[in-house]
């Protein structure tokens, strides 16, 4: 193995992956409230745990953070006797142009900048180890006002190609099928939901313009796991003006024996998860009602809960004959359009299951 990129599972300080004593470089992406049960309910506590990956003399990089988070990261860097630098905007190419990114979304520019600085540092330290000063702590100020920015550099052709070819299934991903476009993003925190919603809003709008000869409908498939705040995650989605919203637990099918280890959580309480879906639907209706009062648009309160991802997908795609009022409303929506845009988000498990179905089922 020439290089290993190790991502922590939860936090950093006490995560099981935090066993590498001498990494080449460390990086921390934008912090958000996640895994609150384990990391604490404040951004300061989360930042403390995340900074647990810092190692003495190993350079660390992060993106611009909230002031309280940056203060904790800086203090932890000083404790661990290492430098911490904030990456600037993504370096331009040699001709001054902005590099193309294979993973779409404005928020990915920040991630790309962190990635290229981590890669550049790895190459420098591996190729010129004797020239690199391992401990830069003495030259660093660690208060938020003085946290140094990493130096910009021109991107080589290999960097440009890497950024352009980068692909992450389930992140800002589009899959086109006959009559349908699936937009998938496993965002599951408030900030990431806001970012991917902006991506979907712009991307779906562009598709509508490019296919102006077709009438379209927008459908949301949503779920999240854990103790996250449903209202906080659903609020950013209200502006998308969905024609129909579907909720389902992170179950591939309603048959337990169909679960696979790659995309299943075997510790989940199925009954509780299904109950949460109904709670999420109720919260969505409240969110949408509040949005009506602050927006000139009038969102449509059409939603439904399904027992599994497969049922939700096939109900949308197959559009079987139904008898209930809700189904009639859905049939009225889908029968009057030529193309359906389906946004799947809220959980990496949910997106993973959708990808599996799209790959294996005749959709």
Regions found by a protein language model. Give the residues of each.
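C-terminal lobe/tail of nucleotide-utilizing enzymes
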Residues: 90-133, 251-254, 304-332
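A glycine-rich beta-strand to alpha-helix segment
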Residues: 316, 328-359
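Nucleotide phosphate-binding/pyrophosphate-handling subdomain across enzymes
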Residues: 2-6, 16-27, 31-35, 45, ...
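Conserved catalytic-core segment of NTP-binding enzymes
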Residues: 9-82, 225-226, 231-234
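C-terminal helical cap/extension that packs against the catalytic core
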Residues: 66-79, 85, 182, 190, ...
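Glycine-rich phosphate-binding loop signature in dinucleotide/nucleotide-binding domains
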Residues: 1-2, 203-215, 319-341
């Amino acid at each position: 193995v020439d290089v290993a990129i190790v991502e922590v599972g939860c936090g950093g300080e006490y995560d099981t992956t935090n066993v590498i004593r001498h990494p080449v470089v460390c990086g921390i992406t934008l912090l958000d409230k996640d895994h609150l049960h384990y990391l604490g309910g404040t951004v300061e506590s989360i930042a403390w745990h995340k900074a647990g990956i810092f190692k003495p003399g190993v350079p660390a990089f992060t993106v611009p953070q909230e002031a309280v988070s940056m203060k904790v990261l800086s203090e932890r860097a000083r404790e661990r006797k290492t430098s911490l630098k904030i990456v600037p905007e993504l370096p331009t190419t040699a001709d001054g142009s902005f590099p193309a990114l294979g993973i779409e979304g404005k928020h990915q520019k920040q991630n790309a900048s962190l990635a290229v600085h981590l890669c550049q540092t790895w190459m420098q330290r591996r190729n010129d180890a004797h020239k690199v000063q391992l401990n830069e702590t003495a030259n660093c100020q660690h208060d938020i006002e003085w946290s140094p920015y990493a130096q910009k550099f021109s991107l080589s052709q290999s960097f440009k190609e890497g950024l352009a070819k980068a692909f992450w299934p389930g992140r800002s991903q589009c899959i086109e099928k006959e009559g349908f476009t699936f937009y998938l993003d496993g965002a599951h925190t408030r900030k990431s939901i806001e970012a991917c919603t902006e991506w979907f809003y712009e991307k779906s709008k562009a598709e509508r313009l490019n296919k102006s000869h077709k009438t379209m409908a927008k459908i949301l498939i949503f779920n999240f796991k854990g103790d996250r705040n449903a209202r906080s995650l659903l609020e950013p989605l209200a502006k998308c003006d969905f024609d129909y919203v579907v909720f389902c637990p992170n179950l591939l099918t309603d048959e337990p024996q169909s679960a696979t280890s790659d995309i299943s959580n075997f510790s989940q309480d199925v009954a509780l998860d299904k109950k949460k879906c109904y709670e999420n639907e109720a919260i969505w209706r409240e969110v949408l009602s509040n949005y009506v009062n602050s927006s000139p648009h009038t969102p449509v309160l059409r939603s439904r809960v399904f027992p599994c991802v497969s049922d939700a997908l096939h109900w949308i795609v197959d559009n079987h004959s139904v008898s209930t009022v809700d189904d009639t409303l859905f049939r009225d929506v889908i029968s009057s359009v030529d193309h359906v845009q389906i946004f799947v988000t809220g959980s990496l498990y949910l997106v993973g299951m959708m990808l599996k179905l799209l790959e294996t089922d005749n959709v």
